[in-house]
Amino acid sequence: MARKFLVGVVLGAVIAAGAPALAREMTSAYVVTAVANLPGAGGTDWHTDLTLYNPHSSVLYVKLVYLPTDTDNSGGAPTAPLIDLQPWETLNLWDVLGPNGFDARGGKGAMLVYADTTANSCPGTAGDTSCDFGVFARNYTLDPSGAGGEFGQDFPGFPANLGVDSTVIAYMPQISDDGDFRTNVGVASWTNAWVTVREDVQDAAGNIVGRYDHPIPPNGHEQWRLETRGLTGGTVAVYLQNAPNTAMVYPYATVVNNATGDATTVEAQITPVGLPGQAASVHAATVRRVALRSVPPPLPAPRFSLAALAHRTR
């Protein structure tokens, strides 16, 4: 298959307006909330495979933007050359943060994946599907013993229009941090400003046993160990505490088996039910209809090679 890179400045990504899609419906802009290429505890080594699928009979042009963790990315973020996703193509980018991709050894963060608004002429109107495509990711740890096995976590692309704004709250259930399991909580932000999220930790009876505020950098990513120990089968709620009216964030959690190192992804369940009154905004009714989200200025990813990424080396 002949493939080319297109060069251009990207001004934004369309997020379909109107009634939100179901979490597993395709859309034109996604956030992969956690990507990695770094050593972990117990001799593990974490990597991310990213897959794109084009359901259309025409080429779709897609952008990838890596948002490193603990970083203010408002001034720019590593951006892959524009990808021409061929009709009905399944494009597998093995170890996307590896040396043939964003070359970010030792790094972790989130990734914006979206149909380029200029190259595709995406209309961004309610119900339009002309730029919809599929985004899937898997975070996995290589077997620390050097054997061929590996364990993977499913991290499907989260539809960008279904994130947490001032109108909704995210719940992540079945959270444990005890003798058997430990939990990490993370938040990715597609907001060009600092955002503070509040984390409420609830026990199984619904009591709030911990409340913590976390600043998230512009277009940034943060992940932390759950602060409340001795929790078994509880729930974490995350909502905006201090943010501009257009803010949108994407929480998630991972629960890790202490004995085996196996991790399970806990995807956020989004709802207006239970939203604290102080988190609501007089502008809330319009926030989820924002049709264009700005992306950070592109920084080069000079080693990014689709041809090299297409070959699995492990």
Question: Model segments located where?
Answer:
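Gly/Pro-rich, tryptophan- and cysteine-flecked surface segments typical
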Residues: 21-314
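Bacterial N-terminal signal peptides
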Residues: 8-17
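Bacterial N-terminal signal peptides that target proteins for export
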Residues: 1-9
